[in-house]
Design a protein with these regions (language model features):
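RNA-contacting regions in translation and RNA-metabolism proteins
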Residues: 1-140
């Protein structure tokens, strides 16, 4: 079960008001605000020519990441990486922990990690919240 704080709820309300997209989850860090939107609402969240995202970035004065939701863990992981081609996803279960090893090409590794590691850190936290699984990046 995902617990949302008052700040999370304020951010979700502002995002939904501006974009019209339905937000399933929100994660706020000092550098980034990340939203998970309902499957099929990603285009609405971004807006024509990125207009909604631009307004939201200005409102929060930090980087904004938007991901599409999925009930399938593998598809959710692919959604976390967006336009970055994921070559392979292997999920290993040991005892009570799950770890997803995500393979990307060496050329895409920097984009997958993100500036200051923000994309991979957010991805790990969101995957842990949604599926109780850790995320490891592997490059080939």
């Amino acid at each position: 079960m995902i617990e949302l704080t008052k700040d999370d709820m304020k951010c979700i309300t502002a995002f939904e008001t501006i974009s019209g997209a339905v937000v399933k989850d929100c994660l706020i860090t000092p550098a980034v605000v990340a939203f998970i939107v309902k499957a099929g609402d990603l285009g609405r969240a971004i807006g024509k020519k990125g207009a909604n995202i631009t307004r939201i970035r200005q409102l929060f004065a930090r980087q904004v990441l938007v991901f599409e939701d999925s009930e399938d863990m593998e598809q959710f992981i692919r959604n976390l990486f967006g336009a970055i081609p994921v070559q392979n996803i292997n999920v290993h279960e040991k005892m009570d922990s799950k770890i997803a090893f995500v393979s990307v090409s060496e050329n895409d590794r920097g984009n997958a990690i993100g500036r200051n590691g923000d994309r991979i850190k957010i991805g790990r936290q969101l995957l842990q919240r949604r599926f109780g699984c850790d995320l490891r990046l592997v490059s080939k």
